[in-house]
Amino acid sequence: MADVSNRVHLNPTTAQLVEIALLRGEGQLTANGALVAKTGERTGRSPNDRFIVKEANTEADIEWGKVNRPFDAGKFDALWGRVEAYLADKELFTSELEVGADDEHYIPVRVTTEFAWHQLFARNLFIAPETFNRGNKDTWQIINAPGFVCEPQRDGTNSEAAVILNFAERKVLLAGLKYAGEMKKSMFSVQNFLLPAKGVLPMHCSANVGHDGDTTLFFGLSGTGKTTLSADPKRFLIGDDEHGWAPGGVFNIEGGCYAKCIDLSQKNEPVIWDAIRFGTVLENVVLDEQRVPDYKDTSLTENSRAAYPLEHIAQRKEDNRGAEPHAVVFLTCDVSGVLPPVSVLSKEQAAYHFLSGYTAKVGSTEMGSTSAIQSTFSTCFGAPFFPRPAGVYAELLMKRIESFGSQVYLVNTGWTGGPHGVGKRFDIPTTRAIVDAIVSGELKDVETVYIDKLNLNVPVSVSGVDTALLNPVNTWADKAEYDKYAQQLAQEFSDNFAKYKVSEAIKNAGPNV
């Protein structure tokens, strides 16, 4: 973007941005040194206001529909021009950042924001390189103008706000909304489109590495435990949300973390707790009279967040990279209480459950979501962010698993002993013990028992886990009731999977109806 203002702060520091944000009344300083900001009525993503410009070069490769809504190229250019005109007399903030911790696969991006705290968020979540765009690649542009109000009839938008991706012009436009997560997810969507063409699998997952260099991936929707479980004091964090898996290794797409704060505690999540300090942005977190964050207060939203750079984590992989993963964990939050806490998956089962993406919306990141918990199927454990047809990503996953020999596990962080409201949720220490067993290799050749209805193989024992919890039928007081719920869940899987055109081997890898 050309200099649309003679008051542009180029590559501002954290201290400068915090200072300016406070002076402008954009947020408050908390007792732990973080900057807290509120986003108004939009406290999550706005999927109905997200568009991709329809143009000849990419039109045939995008799966158009409710997730990827088409936008007219002419309308985009007109709207971009209006937003630039709106920003012309404003004090702005611009940083030269990168998306992708990989020399070959990074995207250079110039981020311009109206708000200082949005710029701090971008600098925390993207990568601030020592030398910008060392490979002289074509640079993307992000403009974020929350004060601009779209007019649907004039602009072609769905409401007063819009998030629009334009692959032909390498532009992302955010207008009329304050929720900062839209910035990071927009560039994730861009990488999700571009990477598969290079043979790289983009993933909605977290990743960490052990002292021996063994990498583990954690796939899952918001609230299933990606950030919590990957922030392991015994291992080194690569990243908490977005990664690429190329032949030879895994790399973080980001340079920071965007952790959910609901019920955050120092005891259960010490790594995240310690990362929240000066330089961190707290989004929609309520403060008490002493400016101490109250992470239990959900009066603003269930989707309160902390955005901090990876440098805030002591135990991290400094190059944001790792070897190919020995273990791949699919995190599912089962509200029916039917699935076991851990299952060992075959390659075909891995493909089936990756495409299914069964889980629950727990403190959903979407605008308007309430505390009501409901089951959902989200393809590739991140349907809102993948522009290409699902099969493209599933095929890449199978290719990577087969070529490296990764073992895939399905881990239920949801309920047992009954559905939500009757049973109880697996506690974090139990899930951590399961993950410890996975990363140690204990479960790779473990003895298993077969659960016919679910078509899953379950370990007969896991170190540190009560054996009675491993087979879910044993945790239900009423076995007939369990069978009823299991049958219902199997049918839901089957109904959802009917839309996929895959091999019989993959089709038959799901629950038995």
UniProtKB/Swiss-Prot annotation:
Pfam families: PEPCK_ATP. Gene3D superfamilies: 3.90.228.20, Phosphoenolpyruvate Carboxykinase, domain 1, Phosphoenolpyruvate Carboxykinase, domain 2. It comes from the Bacteria. GO terms for cellular component: cytosol. Its main location: cytoplasm. One of its GO terms (biological process) is gluconeogenesis. Its cofactor is Mn(2+). One of its GO terms (molecular function) is ATP binding. Its EC number is 4.1.1.49. It is found in: Cytoplasm. It is an enzyme of class 4 (lyase). Binds 1 Mn(2+) ion per subunit. Belongs to the phosphoenolpyruvate carboxykinase (ATP) family. Monomer. This is Phosphoenolpyruvate carboxykinase (ATP).
